[in-house]
Design a protein with these regions (language model features):
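Asparagine-centered strand-capping/turn motif at beta-strand->loop junctions
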Residues: 20-22
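Conserved strand-loop elements at the edges of beta-sheets that form or border functional pockets
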Residues: 10-12, 32, 43, 53
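Extracellular/periplasmic metallocenter environments
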Residues: 2, 43-80
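N-terminal edge beta-strand
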Residues: 1-15
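Short beta-strand/loop motifs in extracellular/secreted proteins, especially
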Residues: 16, 26-28
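Beta-strand-rich interaction surfaces with strong enrichment in secreted/lumenal proteins
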Residues: 5-8, 36-41, 49-50
């Protein structure tokens, strides 16, 4: 399991729109707890998630379905 890309660079204060596509055979979830955003995506489906990074720093994201994060489904949003 993985997110591609696993590192996303953004500018502080800029509205970001992520378009997600689940190309796997199992449901997945994108959880960005720092932004209060989470989305479950069924196999073959797409979803859009929007957020604004309020300050510079690294923000973690991951799939919260049990076992997926430890299997490598995680990443970082780098805001500058």
């Amino acid at each position: 399991f993985s997110f591609s890309p696993s590192v996303i660079n953004v500018k502080v204060g800029e509205r970001i729109k992520l378009v997600l596509k689940n190309e796997g055979q199992a449901p997945h979830n994108l959880d960005i707890s720092d932004f209060g955003e989470t989305r479950v995506i069924s196999p073959g489906e797409m979803a859009t998630l929007s957020f604004t990074a309020p300050s510079s720093g690294d923000y973690n994201f991951f799939c919260s379905i049990p076992g997926h994060e430890t299997a490598g489904m995680k990443g970082i949003i780098k805001a500058e």
